[in-house]
């Protein structure tokens, strides 16, 4: 029977006219599920199942709306239209019918369809009951075997929706966990990224480790659950004391890399505590150089913050710490607190970091390499870089303060050598 779904599913809110769809066409998957749960998103992600002409319809929509057309799978007839605010995917029904297509999906809550022409819900597996119960229940074990990434997706969706995983489904996931070795690491990394970025993701990461889902990539992750499970609370604690620091926890490593700093901190703790081993693990998952470098910096310096009182760190040690960890220092502070370092102790470094004029945390050059070459009449060489480093260290240790001091020291260093 016709129903009143939230306005987010009304064709009036879509980036194209309903008349551009060739009936029968059905909205399926997450958009329907989230509408029934009353969940809203600023980014739309609409998936349609069609019995015929899926790719042609996608191309027609793209042409009429000036959207971007992407052919995702010519053989299975799947195409995407890209808009500024989201995406619309159109796919030919697998199994030759809507019901056949729904029966091939992962979980019952994702096997609900909506007919926008009749405003009817089609729910052959009673996924709406699971929505009311707040559970993820597999459609069949064989569906999970067909695409083992669905094993990880269960944990991600449980975290995302605040749902539980039904016991029989949980048991099947544990048994099928070794099949994840067949999945492209890029797909695994995407699902793990969702969990790392979700404030409710850590308990599900821990359960996933216990159930064998991550043992292929992170063999010893369980050993550091004591730190991992305290990261979010430690971040909240520091953000309450240092609001400016807290704002940076969600910053991306780079504009082109969407991983938040706090997610990198969690990733570092999942990886081996030995930086060399951790680097190999992260390379295997094809993380970017920036993500790997950041995680390794955290792993390198966290033990140092635990080993002795921070107040006993020399200016030289502090300088190299800030230089090496760079923009991920805010989450190094989080990891330190999660690992048992007192907030009062780490505050020495936090205050330096938050002071833009602090020459240890944010050093500036008294002289440049060109200045040295001109003043000392030296050619370009690695020695110039070495002298610049000695000047910087002398400055942070309070032995020099001006440009003249720097040039005098440079001359002395060159004469000595």
Which residues fall in each region the model found?
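Catalytic cores of the polymerase beta-like nucleotidyltransferase superfamily
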Residues: 1-417
């Amino acid at each position: 029977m016709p129903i009143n779904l939230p306005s987010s599913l009304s064709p009036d809110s879509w980036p194209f006219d309903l008349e551009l769809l060739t009936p029968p066409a059905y909205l399926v998957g997450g958009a329907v599920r989230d509408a029934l749960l009353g969940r809203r998103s600023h980014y739309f992600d609409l998936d349609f199942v069609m019995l015929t002409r899926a790719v042609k319809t996608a191309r027609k929509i793209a042409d009429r709306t000036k959207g971007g057309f992407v052919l995702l799978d010519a053989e299975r007839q799947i195409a995407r239209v890209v808009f500024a605010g989201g995406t619309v995917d159109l796919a030919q029904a697998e199994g030759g019918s809507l019901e056949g297509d729904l029966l091939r999906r992962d979980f019952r809550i994702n096997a609900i369809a909506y007919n926008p022409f009749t405003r009817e819900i089609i729910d052959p597996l009673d996924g709406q009951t699971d929505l009311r119960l707040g559970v993820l229940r597999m459609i069949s074990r064989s569906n999970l075997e067909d695409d083992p990434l669905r094993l990880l997706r269960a944990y991600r969706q449980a975290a995302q929706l605040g749902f539980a995983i039904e016991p029989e489904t949980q048991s099947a996931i544990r048994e099928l966990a070794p099949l994840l070795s067949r999945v492209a690491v890029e797909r695994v990394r995407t699902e793990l990224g969702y969990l790392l970025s979700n404030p409710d993701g850590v308990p599900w990461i821990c359960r996933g480790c216990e159930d064998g889902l991550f043992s292929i990539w992170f063999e010893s992750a369980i050993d550091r659950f004591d730190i991992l499970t305290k990261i979010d609370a430690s971040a909240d604690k520091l953000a309450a004391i240092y609001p400016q620091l807290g704002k940076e926890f969600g910053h991306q490593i780079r504009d082109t890399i969407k991983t938040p700093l706090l997610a990198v901190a969690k990733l570092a703790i999942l990886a081996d505590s030995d930086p060399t081993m951790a680097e190999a693990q992260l390379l295997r998952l094809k993380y970017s150089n920036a993500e790997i470098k950041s995680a390794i910096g955290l792993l390198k310096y966290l033990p140092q913050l635990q080993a002795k009182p921070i107040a006993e760190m020399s200016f030289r040690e502090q300088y190299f710490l800030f230089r090496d960890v760079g923009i991920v220092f805010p989450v190094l502070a989080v990891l330190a607190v999660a690992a048992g370092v007192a907030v009062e102790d780490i505050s020495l470094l936090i205050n330096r970091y938050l002071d833009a004029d602090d020459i240890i945390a944010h050093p500036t050059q008294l002289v440049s390499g060109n200045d040295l070459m001109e003043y000392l009449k030296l050619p370009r060489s690695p020695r110039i870089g070495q002298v610049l480093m000695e000047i910087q260290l002398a400055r942070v240790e309070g032995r020099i303060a001006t440009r003249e001091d720097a040039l005098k020291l440079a001359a002395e260093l060159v004469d000595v050598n």
